[in-house]
Every structure is written in structure tokens, then in C-alpha cells.
A protein has these predicted regions:
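Noncatalytic, solvent-exposed loop/strand surfaces
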Residues: 1-182
């Protein structure tokens, strides 16, 4: 894309802004002319996936779901992961002590599948962003007290295609990446 990033963030330097009633620390994800964003409200009791038009900033759709509030670190949010995208779907993950919820929506906002991968234990809250690799959604879920796993879900169905148990006793915050041998 042909654009220049401004050195100052002033109103004259951006085309539109989008006031949000909810919050989150994840980054927006862009596919074509659509911007997707995860957000949360009411101390995590509501989780939201939002789609806006990248040209105008107008909200195209919002999908909100009930969730459970829980303790998290004061510098974390209840929506700290970035959505993953492919040409057909937007994928989001949300974690708290009793569940790790992965979901897929089509680009028009219709829910395709949801999958609960168990809880997340850790004093700082959940913050992992999934990635799409080929036809798999990759989600790490290391646990502070051990017993976590890394998952590969089928992008189309949400079925677990593989799971790697992890002995780690540290919570994961990094986004996975795919290594290609030279």
C-alpha cells in the first residue's frame, strides 16, 4: 500500500477515528477494506468482535458474547489478543481461568464455530494472539502451573487437528510463528 506514516498523531494526520465503548490491548487486523478488532466491556463480562470499513471507519457489524469476569493484571485488558484472518474467516481467542474460547466468524459476522480449550492459569491474564498457517489456527496455551498445550484447530470446523502437551510452568504471551528451514 502506498502511504506515509505520520511522525505526529494529530487529527489532521488521519482520515477517521472510531470511538469505542469497550477496550482492549490487541491490534486491529485488516483484510481488504475491513478492519477487525477484539474488545471487552464490564470487566470481561462481555467479549466483542467488531468489523469496520477501512475506508470510512463506519462499523459494519459487532458481535458480542457473554463471558466471565476474572482477576487480571492492572496493565492487561480482557481483550489483549489480535484477531487472525484468512480470506473467509476472522478468528478470535479469549481466555480466563475456566475457559479458553476460540471462535471463527465469516467476514460478514456470522458465527461459524466456537471451541473451548480449557482454562488459562496465570496472574497476568490472557494475551496470546493466534495465527493462521495453511488450514490451521495455531493457539499456544502454556499454563503458569503446568499442564498447558499448544493447539492446531481446523480453520473450517474448529476441530482439534493436533495438540502438543507442554510442561512449561510459565504463561505464554508470545504470538506463534512458523519456521521455514533454509
Amino acid at each position: 500500500a502506498d502511504c506515509q506514516i505520520p511522525s505526529e498523531w494529530k487529527k489532521k494526520n488521519f482520515r477517521w477515528s472510531l470511538p469505542l465503548e469497550e477496550s482492549g490491548h490487541g491490534s486491529p487486523a485488516v483484510w481488504g477494506n475491513r478492519v477487525f478488532l477484539n474488545a471487552s466491556a464490564k470487566k470481561g463480562k462481555t467479549r466483542t468482535i467488531l468489523c469496520a470499513d477501512a475506508r470510512s471507519g463506519e462499523i459494519e457489524w459487532i458481535r458480542s458474547y457473554a463471558s466471565k469476569t476474572h482477576r487480571t493484571h492492572r496493565y492487561n485488558s480482557f481483550a489483549s489478543s489480535t484477531p487472525a484472518l484468512d480470506e473467509k474467516r476472522v478468528y478470535s481467542v479469549w481466555g480466563h481461568p475456566s475457559e479458553l474460547k476460540a471462535s471463527a466468524h465469516d467476514h460478514q459476522g456470522r458465527l461459524i464455530w466456537e471451541k473451548d480449550l480449557g482454562g488459562v492459569t496465570g496472574g497476568h491474564g490472557f494475551g496470546v494472539s493466534p495465527i493462521v498457517h495453511q488450514d490451521l489456527l495455531i493457539i499456544p496455551n502454556d499454563q503458569e502451573k503446568g499442564g498447558g498445550s499448544h493447539y492446531a484447530l481446523d480453520c473450517k470446523t474448529g476441530a482439534i487437528r493436533w495438540q502438543v502437551p507442554r510442561a512449561s510452568r510459565r504463561l505464554t504471551y508470545s504470538t506463534p510463528c512458523v519456521f521455514t528451514s533454509p
